[in-house]
Amino acid sequence: VIIITGKGSCFCAGYDLSYDNSKDLPYHASKTDGFWPRHVVEGAFKIWDLSTPVIAEVHGYCLAGGTELAASCDLVYCSDDAELGYPVVRSMSPPDNQFFPWLLGMRNAMEMMLTGETITGKQAAENGFANKSFSAEILSKEVEKIASKVAKVPSDIQAINKRSIHRQMEIMGMRDGITAGTELQALAMHSNSTKEHLKELSSGLKEALDKR
């Protein structure tokens, strides 16, 4: 079993905005229009397709790309006071990885997409994004207990157990739906509002983010 968590005060506050996108990507994605969301989705399904169970231990901020990382994991456990959301919808685009409707249901997903507001770790567990939430003080200990239970099952059986759930989700269209969603993210990057926001970002990150 694999546990993914953040070092320091948060799980993940999003993509590294200082990264040079002109560099080769770690996964194959042709650099045509929409290459970035395709690359993100491909990376998410690398975790999805692992035979080993993957657990996300979420504390502090879990925003934008951080929510995509957590959503790709098999089990998600949050601190009660964690903050999860995709604030980028206020200024640029929907998520690269369209997992919200699948995990949260239509109404909860729509509210997050139209407002850009965050939810707490406790709400994430209530809404279906996470399995459970715990107080921050005991989160790691509780996740270790769960990981120990998962690890007791033989790995060959666990691989089939994991795949049995994924097979049903894929029959319902989850993989195809998330992959198709990359086209909407790519389309959003051509909107006038997004182009204007990118100009604002180049002038000053904090000022641009504070505006939205």
What does each of the following model-derived ranges do?
Residues 1-5:
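Conserved CoA-thioester-binding segment of acyl-CoA-metabolizing enzymes
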Residues 6-42, 206-208:
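Glycine- (often His-adjacent) and acidic-residue-rich active-site loop
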Residues 11, 116-121, 141, 145-148, ...:
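C-terminal alpha-helix plus adjacent terminal tail
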Residues 34-41, 137-140, 175:
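Non-membrane alpha-helical structural segments and their capping/turn regions in soluble enzymes
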Residues 43-44, 181:
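Alpha-helical packing segments of well-folded alpha/beta enzyme cores
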Residues 45-158:
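Crotonase-fold acyl-CoA enzyme core
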